[in-house]
Amino acid sequence: MTRITRLIIALLLTTVSLFGQNEFKRVGKSGFGFLKISPSARAAGMGDAFTAVANDVTAIFYNPAGLTNIESFDFSFNHTDWIVNSSIISGVVAMPFGRSGNLGLSFIKFDTEDFEETTVLEPEGTGRTIQAGDIALALAYALKLTDNLSFGFKAQYIEETIDIDKAKAITADFSTYYRTGFRDLTLAMIMKNFGPEAKFLSDKFKLPLYFNINTAMSLIGEQGSAFQWLVSAESAFATDYRDRYHLGTEIWIADLVAVRGGYKFFYDTEDWTVGAGLKLGVGSREIIIDVAYSNFVEYFDPPLRFSIGGSF
């Protein structure tokens, strides 16, 4: 293992202790909540235990280092019917760039239902419509440091709008993707949404900083096999909530149909998830369609996610 490899792993691992120091002081201390919502139907169907899976173009959302698995010009478009009549659309393209690197571009757009303005003097409504929403634009670069270890970096511009007022911020993600050499066992880590405090009007707030550690391996078969059974376990440490854990699984049959399931521990509104995927051949290329369902508490309608992706 090279010096730079050891340095990157050491820097990422030391952040675990920083997250753990304030275990009981973290709830509700960040903004830009839409960044916590999983955009990909494949990842959501696996309970978001995806950091060490991340072998398709949606890796840009979960582990930019995983973009080194991309060998052509790939794309993905995703739609989520979220709670309270809100929705999320996202898209990403990625391609090889340089001898050992890959480049990715992505966007996320979060839209809420318009609502009527109310004031102290007019609590029933003024007749004026208020619009609100969020957007994130990102550029990512992934590089193979060795045959087994990849490093990823993502810079992201985020903006939140409520009527005429805006909050803006720049964030950075740092991640690793390590292929152990034992079967297809993979270890991965990411620090997400690193950046300075943002400001909305006169109020300052922190970004939803996360540090995730994940391991994944196929118990049966491997990618492209007639039958593959993949399992994944992930720990998520956050600055604004207690530690959380994700378990996920994915089964591919004939490298054509996928069935997925997962469970998210210590979430207020979510627990189990299920999903499915279909791979279609189009000439020498392929199109993959994914769908996912997340179980929510009784107060909210369960969100549905749809994704379509492929290569050129």
Name each model-derived stretch.
Residues 3-10:
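Sec-dependent signal peptide recognition
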Residues 11-19:
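Hydrophobic h-region of N-terminal signal peptides that target proteins for export
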Residues 21-312:
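Subset of outer-membrane beta-barrel
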